[in-house]
From Swiss-Prot:
Disordered: annotated span: 156-180
GO cellular component: nucleus
Annotated localization: Nucleus
Protein known as: Growth-regulating factor 4
Provenance organism: Oryza sativa subsp. japonica
Gene Ontology molecular function, alphabetical: ATP binding
Note: Plants over-expressing GRF4 exhibit increased grain length, width and weight. Plants silencing GRF4 exhibit dwarfism, delayed growth and inflorescence formation.
Matching PROSITE patterns: QLQ, WRC
Complex formation: Interacts with GIF1. Interacts with GSK2.
């Protein structure tokens, strides 16, 4: 049924001053006051009892709305007229409806068991400052939530698996203890014996360690520390760990099951052959007219020809360290008191000019093998010096 809402009348516009006129114009088919028992239209007070206002005969035909419902219906009808006319609705008409909806929602939806509030799609937190970590049932964490977070420090990273151990603990567990390094050092020693590069030579770890096996323990501490800082190799740690603190020459335990006497005889034989083929290697150092200050130039190794460190055999590149501690101590004392010989670029290039040195080669006890190893990196002249001394001693 259409209602006569043709236009806004002054009475409707001024509904706050005259609510009776607005009600009459909006709802002409409804009475503003309830009917009396006799039907004469006499209104009774609001404080009158229900039986006095509505007799049993008229109680069967009660009006469809109460007084409060009439007021709300009038307000909604007025808002509807504003919407139809295209006029903005005054805020004082909207606020009562909003308050009514808030009270209605608080009455039906704000139950403590449900926890839902009006105009909210998710559950409200009854304790905002508490950690929201739960087990899905009744338990909840009692700690305070961290700033800018819904959880405490413990439950902030709940997605990670906390049963795993920290990374630092795993690294310590995976690292080998010092005792296992000694047991597994035999394999690197055997692998180093087959290499042709001087970087895998066992002389360097022996020099780097002050108490290491081989010739390193017979050298002065200052010389050993100086060479140890220069000749440090990546694979020198297992050798130093094996040889440190012991007096045994461990280099000969990784080359096979031959006895030490057989290996000494083989080294001396090859050293004698090398000294015969290359007599220019055996210059006496005490007759050298060049002091230490004359070493202003360090020539390249191209003058060596075929006698380069890479062309030397494996046996020639091994240092000679089985003559004893007394013999090496004498050599170390001689080394400090002697001057260095000229380098390769200052020597004669041909073998004819070496004929005058034949007599000097016979007197081989006047120079030490340790000094010769300074100019020849592979220390092949150590074997020549040692074999010559043993020959003169016989």
């Amino acid at each position: 049924m259409a209602m006569p809402y043709a236009s806004l009348s002054p009475a409707v516009a001024d509904h706050r001053s005259s609510p009776a006129a607005a009600t009459a114009s909006l709802l002409p088919f409804c009475r503003s006051t309830p009917l009396s028992a006799g039907g004469g239209g006499v209104a009774m007070g609001e404080d009158a009892p229900m039986t006095a206002r509505w007799p049993p005969a008229a109680a069967a035909r009660l009006p469809p709305f109460t007084a409060a419902q009439y007021e709300e219906l009038e307000q909604q009808a007025l808002i509807y007229k504003y919407l139809v006319a295209g006029v903005p609705v005054p805020p004082d008409l909207v606020l009562p409806i909003r308050r009514g909806l808030d009270s209605l929602a608080a009455r039906f939806y704000n139950h403590p068991a449900l926890g839902y509030g009006p105009y909210f799609g998710k559950k409200l937190d009854p304790e905002p400052g508490r950690c929201r970590r739960t087990d899905g049932k009744k338990w909840r964490c009692s700690k305070e939530a961290a700033p800018d977070s819904k959880y405490c420090e413990r439950h902030m990273h709940r997605g990670r698996n906390r049963s795993r151990k920290p990374v630092e603990t795993q690294l310590v567990a995976q690292s080998q203890p010092p005792s296992s390094v000694v047991g597994s050092a035999a394999a690197p020693l055997a692998a180093a014996s087959n290499g042709s590069s001087f970087q895998n030579h066992s002389l360097y770890p022996a020099i780097a360690g002050s108490n290491g096996g081989g010739g390193g323990r017979n050298m002065p501490s200052s010389f050993g520390s100086a060479l140890g800082s220069q000749l440090h190799m990546d694979n020198a740690a297992p050798y130093a760990a094996v040889g440190g603190g012991t007096g045994k020459d461990l280099r000969y335990t990784a080359y096979g099951t031959r006895s030490l006497a057989d290996e000494q005889s083989q080294l001396i034989t090859e050293a004698i052959n090398t000294s015969i083929e290359n007599p220019w290697r055996l210059l006496p150092s005490q007759n050298s007219p060049f002091p230490l200050s004359s070493y202003s130039q360090l020539g390249a190794l191209s003058d060596l020809g075929q006698n380069t460190p890479s062309s030397l055999s494996k046996v020639q590149r091994q240092p000679l360290s089985f003559f004893g501690n007394d013999y090496a101590a004498v050599d170390s004392v001689k080394q400090e008191n002697q001057t260095l010989r000229p380098f390769f670029d200052e020597w004669p290039k041909g073998r004819d000019s070496w004929s005058d040195l034949a007599d000097e080669n016979a007197n081989l006890s006047s120079f030490s093998g340790t000094q010769l190893s300074i100019s020849i990196p592979m220390a092949s002249s150590d074997f020549s010096a040692a074999s010559s001394r043993s020959t003169n001693g016989d």
